[in-house]
Amino acid sequence: MIACLTAANLVAAVRLVHDILSNNKLFANNANGLLATGGVIWATNVIAFALWYWDLDRGGAAARAHYPQANPAFVFPEMLHTDYVPANWVPKFVDYLSLGFWTATAFSPTDISAIKPWAKLLMVSEAAVSLVIAALVVARAINILA
């Protein structure tokens, strides 16, 4: 299911980039439509990658529930500051959603570090897609409004 969401969003992103680069008339004078479309694709990208992080880290949510400390791919601040969290703390979906949001917004890790190669590659992929969408959509919208 996550793969379907990711594939559909990738197709939408590629079509949007193609429409922008080919000067498609769909967004010729419609900055609001362009920004809304880009925003939906960007937000879906954040959610899709958050789902990937959540599903793949430590074997998924079910495996984390049984073996919370088993082989993490990400180091969360709560893992380093154990005085401030319960002893049995494990990451929840909101932790992976914040990872997805900050990766897409800052184009880099913030307070959550990837320590497995696959996790680093996922973060690079998410940041690259977000950068392309943000740069092209904002540049084209400014061009339309100017």
PLM features per residue range, with description:
Residues 58-111:
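Membrane-proximal soluble regions of multi-pass membrane proteins
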Residues 31, 35-40, 68-73, 107-124:
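Hydrophobic alpha-helical transmembrane segments and immediately flanking/interface helices
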Residues 14, 18, 53, 57, ...:
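Membrane-water interface at transmembrane helix exits
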Residues 25-62:
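Pore-domain transmembrane helices of cation channels
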Residues 40, 44-47, 84-92, 117, ...:
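Hydrophobic alpha-helical transmembrane segments
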Residues 91-146:
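Pore domain of cation channels
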Residues 1-16, 40, 44-51, 98-102, ...:
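Hydrophobic alpha-helical transmembrane segments of multi-pass integral membrane proteins
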Residues 18-26:
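Long, contiguous internal "core" modules enriched in hydrophobic/ aromatic residues
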